[in-house]
């Protein structure tokens, strides 16, 4: 959604934080699903780092399809910032976005696994 990307860039241009879920929706299971390239694209375009965040124990709080919220122990793990490549001539090849997305997926899996371990979930 081009309009949404423009709004996100405007938020980042103001120096404000932006939260994205690069999988596009809540997922279940032990692995991070394939990511959309939007987070990497925005990081490269705005020249800002991506901070991977992993959540553990949230599947039981509000299971997909549920309208109820259940009290459960959850954990949040914040990873190290991932700095996007900087284009010397103002443009980067499309592969830079793909590579940053792949790096983000690995980092998200690490923090996701740590967050699950903190609440006693097996990985």
Show where each model-derived region lies.
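Non-catalytic C-terminal accessory region of glycerolipid acyltransferases
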Residues: 2-123
């Amino acid at each position: 959604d081009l309009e949404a990307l423009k709004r996100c860039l405007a938020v980042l241009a103001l120096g404000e934080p932006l939260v994205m879920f690069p999988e596009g929706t809540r997922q279940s299971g032990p692995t991070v699903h394939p990511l959309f390239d939007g987070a990497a694209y925005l990081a490269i375009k705005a020249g800002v780092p991506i901070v991977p965040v992993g959540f553990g124990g949230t599947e039981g709080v509000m299971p997909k399809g549920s309208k109820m919220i259940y009290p459960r122990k959850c954990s949040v793990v914040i990873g190290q910032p991932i700095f996007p490549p900087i284009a010397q001539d103002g443009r980067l090849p499309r592969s830079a976005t793909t590579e940053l997305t792949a790096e983000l997926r690995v980092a998200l899996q690490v923090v996701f696994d740590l967050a699950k371990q903190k609440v006693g979930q097996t990985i």
